[in-house]
Every structure is written in structure tokens, then in C-alpha cells.
Amino acid sequence: MTLLGTALRPAATRVMLLGSGELGKEVAIECQRLGVEVIAVDRYADAPAMHVAHRSHVINMLDGDALRRVVELEKPHYIVPEIEAIATDMLIQLEEEGLNVVPCARATKLTMNREGIRRLAAEELQLPTSTYRFADSKSLFREAVAAIGYPCIVKPVMSSSGKGQTFIRSAEQLAQAWEYAQQGGRAGAGRVIVEGVVKFDFEITLLTVSAVDGVHFCAPVGHRQEDGDYRESWQPQQMSPLALERAQEIARKVVLALGGYGLFGVELFVCGDEVIFSEVSPRPHDTGMVTLISQDLSEFALHVRAFLGLPVGGIRQYGPAASAVILPQLTSQNVTFDNVQNAVGADLQIRLFGKPEIDGSRRLGVVLATSESVVDAIERAKHAAGQVKVQG
């Protein structure tokens, strides 16, 4: 039996978001639909989820003491990380003291660090992955590259959105790649992973829900990446029945090994009928924003339903759908959007995230489209996103 209180009343059910970006905003909205009290936390003021939360706090989430203080102040029933850059050792302590970390503190800690999740997948679960080596010095980095061979990819073990990554084709790139990786890590200079290049036909995100009524899968989401960030995503990605079966089996093993209830974004490479594990996020995935238009329950609704202990039941996918990001480049603390009328219509929607400022390139919104085919849905979403003029 699941008991939910009413927000702002003594018996309220309280959810604290750690990270309040566009994904956290949609989680907050889904919590609001169920009368749940939402506290949004981030490193900067006026983050998107703060716009739709009951209260908000600005802290350095890598500071364990600051994190404990805000948790003790608000006394949440659920702590929901939206990003990786969090003091995960403190989350483990808080969980040991009886707090509910979503999906669980171990999953948050393992997936914060590429080494943790890669060793779990490849060494413990024996899943197919790219070849890899870890290095924490320039000399060991050179040895790792020599062992993997060219071409290869170097990434900080702790980074996101493509920061610090280099595709290495020759020895001439090694010094620069090492320095770039040191600059791109979330915790500053440190350890890197060197990966062999995987030959694949396409990448997918398999949104996988672990809930009280078992493990559920959304239709596979295809996506296109550029500079480490997604530009378009679509659903469903066509793949062979055998490849889909293998993808679901890999995703099931990963989420059950990580533990807890919630939605996981499992990233996979697909080549014919072969499937190779890439990464996993124990939370809604940016490529999954397409589910805001493609499913009866978005990835955000599924995440909330799962961590509150509610059954998922089934997931209905409506047909070909796509998302395309609005990614301007400018500097402004007073952003406006023109021509928005060209990004809405029949089977066409827009989400503007409400980020308070931009300095360079930043994802500020997404256009969602459905159509008779995935190809047409992608083109509709891209065209409409290109019509929106961002000014500041």
C-alpha cells in the first residue's frame, strides 16, 4: 500500500531534487500532479525545476556537509539525484541512516564514475563492452593507448556532456588529449578511461523502469550526438527482434545489479544483431525527452511512479516521434524566444526550459514532433527548432 500526503500539509510527501535542470523540472511537474511537495536544489539560483517547486536551495552539491544540512532542514522522504556531480559518499551515509535515495545510493555512486560502472558491467556482469584501460598519469595514459591501439577515445572517468573527450587517431594527439581530459573532469585533474572504438550501426537509449511490479522497457530511442551532446532523438528505433531481446537482457541485468526503483537510461551500441553496453544513468535521460510526446507515460512520469512505489502496469507508445534541441550560442541574462508560433501546431510541441542565462552554447529548449514515419518526425522537429530565434 502506497500512502501519499498532501503538499504543504503536516503529512506531506516530500521529494528533494538534487539538480534542477530541464529533466528535474519535468520530474517536479510529475510530482506536482500527485500532490507531492517538491524541494529543488542546485548550484545556481532560478534553475528550471525551481520554477515549479515549492521551495528551493542553492548549494555546492559536491560539499557533503552542505548537502547534509539541507537534507536535515527539509527532511525529504525521497532524495532524487538529477545529475552526477553530487557528494555520493554523503548520499550513502544518509541512506544508511534511513533516507530513501533514488534509485539507491550505490547506483548513484557507481554511475558517477565511468570506472565503477564499466567494471560492474564488464567484469562483474560479464556484459559485452568496448575494450578499455584506465590511467591516472601521463605515462600510464600512453601505455593504455598503446595497448588499445588507434583509433581510440579518451574520457575523464568523471565528466558529462562530452567534456574532456578526444577521439585519438595518432600519437601526435596524445599530449593535447591528456591535457583536455584533465580540464574536463568534474572533480578536476585525475583518472581517465581509454576505450577502443566500437563499430556500430546506431546507438540507442533503452529507457528501463525497475518498479514494484517488475522491470519494464520503453521502445528503443535512437539519437544523434554531436560534440558529446544529443541533437535529435527519435522513437522507436528500428532494430531486429534478436537485437532488441539482447538489449533488454543487458538492460535488465544492469538495472537489477544497480538496485532500487526508478527509471534508468541504458545506452547501447547496436551492430546487426549484436549489442554492446556503453553507459547507464540511474535517472531520466536527455534523449528520452521524446517520450513527452511519444508515450502515454513519459520517462519522467515513469520515474516518479516507480520511486514512489506505484506499479507501472504498461507503457503505450503512440508511434513515430522525434525531438530536436534548441541550442543557441550567445551571452545573455535576459533571453527571449521569437517565432515560437512556428514550433507549435498539429502533432508539434515545444518545451522552453527557463534557464536564467547563457554564456556560449547551451540547450534552452526542445521541439517534439510526431508523424507517419520516424524520418519525417525528425525533419519536422529539426525544422521547427530551427525556426525559433533566440535573442538576448
Swiss-Prot record:
The keyword Ligase applies. Its EC number is 6.3.1.21. It is an enzyme of class 6 (ligase). One of its GO terms (biological process) is 'de novo' IMP biosynthetic process. Pathway: Purine metabolism; IMP biosynthesis via de novo pathway; N(2)-formyl-N(1)-(5-phospho-D-ribosyl)glycinamide from N(1)-(5-phospho-D-ribosyl)glycinamide (formate route): step 1/1. Keywords: ATP-binding, Ligase, Magnesium, Metal-binding, Nucleotide-binding, Purine biosynthesis. Residues 119-308 form the ATP-grasp domain. N(1)-(5-phospho-beta-D-ribosyl)glycinamide binds at E22, L23, E82, D286, K355, R362, R363. One of its GO terms (molecular function) is magnesium ion binding. It comes from the Bacteria. InterPro entries: ATP-grasp, ATP-grasp_carboxylate-amine, ATP_grasp_subdomain_1, PreATP-grasp_dom_sf, PurT, PurT/PurK_preATP-grasp, PurT_C, Rudment_hybrid_motif. PROSITE patterns: ATP_GRASP (PS50975). It catalyses: N(1)-(5-phospho-beta-D-ribosyl)glycinamide + formate + ATP = N(2)-formyl-N(1)-(5-phospho-beta-D-ribosyl)glycinamide + ADP + phosphate + H(+). Homodimer. Belongs to the PurK/PurT family. HAMAP family: PurT (MF_01643). Involved in the de novo purine biosynthesis. Catalyzes the transfer of formate to 5-phospho-ribosyl-glycinamide (GAR), producing 5-phospho-ribosyl-N-formylglycinamide (FGAR). Formate is provided by PurU via hydrolysis of 10-formyl-tetrahydrofolate. This is Formate-dependent phosphoribosylglycinamide formyltransferase. It comes from Shigella flexneri. The gene is purT.
